[in-house]
Amino acid sequence: METLSFEFPAGQPGRGRALVGCVGSGDLEVLLEPGQPGKLSIQVQTSVNGSASRWQHLFERLFDGQTPPALLIDIHDFGATPGVVRLRLEQGFEEIGHD
C-alpha cells in the first residue's frame, strides 16, 4: 500500500463536492472538494506499489492544455486501469460543475 501526493496549477475553487465510484466497483473511489485558489492537490492511496510515475503521467495527460478547478482530490485505488481513473475523474469534474 502506498500514499502518493501530487500538485498542479489550477484556477478558482470548484463549487461543490462529489464522490464517484467505489473501491468494490471498478476498483476506484474518487472524492473531490473545493481547494485553495491556484492549486489542485491530489492524494492517491493505492494498493500498487511503485506506481508513482504512472499516476504522474496520467494526471499530466489529463490536465494538459487546460486549467482545472482548484480542488482537493482523494483517490482510493485498488488496481484500477488508467481508463477507469480518467472516467471517474471526468465524472467527478462533471458532478461538481452542476448547480
UniProtKB/Swiss-Prot annotation:
Keywords: Cytoplasm, Phosphoprotein. It is found in: Cytoplasm. The keyword Metal-binding does not apply. One of its GO terms (molecular function) is acyl carrier activity. Covalently binds the prosthetic group of malonate decarboxylase. The keyword Cytoplasm applies. Its main location: cytoplasm. One of its GO terms (cellular component) is cytoplasm. Signal peptide: none annotated. The modification O-(phosphoribosyl dephospho-coenzyme A)serine is found at S25. Subunit of malonate decarboxylase, it is an acyl carrier protein to which acetyl and malonyl thioester residues are bound via a 2'-(5''-phosphoribosyl)-3'-dephospho-CoA prosthetic group and turn over during the catalytic mechanism. Belongs to the MdcC family. This is Malonate decarboxylase acyl carrier protein. It comes from Pseudomonas fluorescens (strain ATCC BAA-477 / NRRL B-23932 / Pf-5). The lineage of its organism: Bacteria, Pseudomonadati, Pseudomonadota, Gammaproteobacteria, Pseudomonadales.
